[in-house]
Swiss-Prot record:
Name under which the protein is recorded: 7-methyl-GTP pyrophosphatase
Main location: cytoplasm
Statement: the UniProt record of this protein carries the keyword Cytoplasm: yes
Source organism (scientific name): Escherichia coli O157:H7
Job description of the protein: Nucleoside triphosphate pyrophosphatase that hydrolyzes 7-methyl-GTP (m(7)GTP). May have a dual role in cell division arrest and in preventing the incorporation of modified nucleotides into cellular nucleic acids.
Entry EC no(s): 3.6.1.-
Keyword Cytoplasm part of the UniProt annotation: yes
Residues forming the catalytic site: 69 (proton acceptor)
Sites annotated Important for substrate specificity: 12, 70, 154
Subcellular location: Cytoplasm
Length: 194
């Protein structure tokens, strides 16, 4: 049975994959994440997830390698990590009363036989109307400076939303586990069977 590799150093993706109670290792993929000028958000995350998984194939032959990438889209524009409190407040002002869509690309690459499975999972976050005071307090309390969209849905960010829409809530954190389980089963690795 091939061993499992997560092509990521993200502690959030690691924590999500640990939910499946299967052994795996993490490795940093070497991929240029610069978007191509003609790529849609869906195309970007699909390409990057695939490249991340395949970039580790030579280091990990005979493995199942998981690649994942995510973008946050508001008003048709990709929204990155804010990195500063002012940028976080600006992103949250734009999101207030709007829908932010996350696209998460997922790839499972079998480096033993070259079989590749891919999927893009969308997830919509409906923001309620936020006051300036609410935005300021949220940024001060949560410090979401390294989170695309300037919030942590798994934390205090839940207070910002009217509703969430998507097939798998794990998608919002960065790894669609329902789709991944389906891919793993197709490779003969059922998480429920050890």
């Amino acid at each position: 049975m091939p061993k499992l590799i997560l092509a990521s150093t993200s502690p959030w993706r690691r924590a999500l994959l640990e939910k499946l109670q299967i052994s795996f290792e993490c490795a940093a993929p070497e991929v240029d994440e610069t978007p191509h000028s003609d790529e849609s958000p869906r195309q970007l995350v699909l390409r990057l997830a695939q490249e991340k998984a395949q970039s580790l194939a030579s280091r990990y032959p005979d493995h199942l390698i998981i690649g994942s990438d995510q973008v946050c889209v508001l008003d048709g524009e990709i929204t990155g990590k804010p990195l500063t409190e002012e940028n976080a407040r600006l992103q949250l002002r734009k999101a207030s009363g709007n829908i932010v869509t996350f696209y998460t690309g997922l790839a499972l690459f079998n480096s033993a036989n070259g079989h590749l499975q891919t999927e893009v999972e969308p997830f919509d976050v409906h923001f309620r109307h936020l006051s300036e005071a609410e935005i300021d307090n949220y940024v001060r309390k949560e410090h979401p400076l390294h989170c695309a969209g300037s919030f942590k849905s798994e934390g205090f960010g839940i207070t910002l939303f009217e509703r969430l829409e998507g097939r798998d809530p794990n998608t919002l954190v960065g790894l669609p586990l329902i789709a991944l389980c389906q891919m793993l089963r197709r490779e003969g690795k059922n998480p429920l069977m050890g």
